[in-house]
Amino acid sequence: MPSFDVVSEANMIEVKNAIEQSNKEISTRFDFKGSDARVEQKERELTLFADDDFKLGQVKDVLIGKLAKRNVDVRFLDYGKVEKIGGDKVKQIVTVKKGVTGDLAKKIVRLVKDSKIKVQASIQGDAVRVAGTKRDDLQSVIAMLRKDVTDTPLDFNNFRD
């Protein structure tokens, strides 16, 4: 019975490359000359440092641009609040989301069941497994999910025949 998994996961290698490119651009840009603006990464947590709120916005724009160039969807980013750290300096924690959350998984299962396509959807940890008898049914489920779920980037992998 053919099946596939619906997952939501950013390519962390591309995220790391985008951070390195962002830091390189920030270090060479004239408007950041003499400032302590940078982006640091620890696992799935990014920390943006800047001298003030305006420069923090600039750092964020540079990072988003580099992520977009490397085909990493910016909807994976979850921005924390801006914190003041000593003097005028500010930082912001940005987490990279991973996995299909419980609410989103329930929404996906509900959409699949309401579509009346002859497939079964089940939640398995951070993924939703969709299984059916025909490959065409699975392809129509993929098209339907791409159209209906727009708030979170979805990937489809682990295709089995």
From Swiss-Prot:
Family note: Belongs to the YajQ family.
Molecular-function GO term, any one: nucleotide binding
Protein source organism: Burkholderia vietnamiensis (strain G4 / LMG 22486) (Burkholderia cepacia (strain R1808))
Domain of life: Bacteria
Annotated protein name in UniProt: Nucleotide-binding protein Bcep1808_2648
InterPro entries xrefs: DUF520 (IPR007551), UPF0234_N (IPR035570), YajQ-like_sf (IPR036183)
Alphabetic keyword roster: Nucleotide-binding
Function of the protein: Nucleotide-binding protein.
Cellular-component GO terms for this entry: cytosol
NCBIfam families found in the cross-reference section: PRK05412.1 (NF003819)
Pfam families named among the record's database cross-references: DUF520 (PF04461)
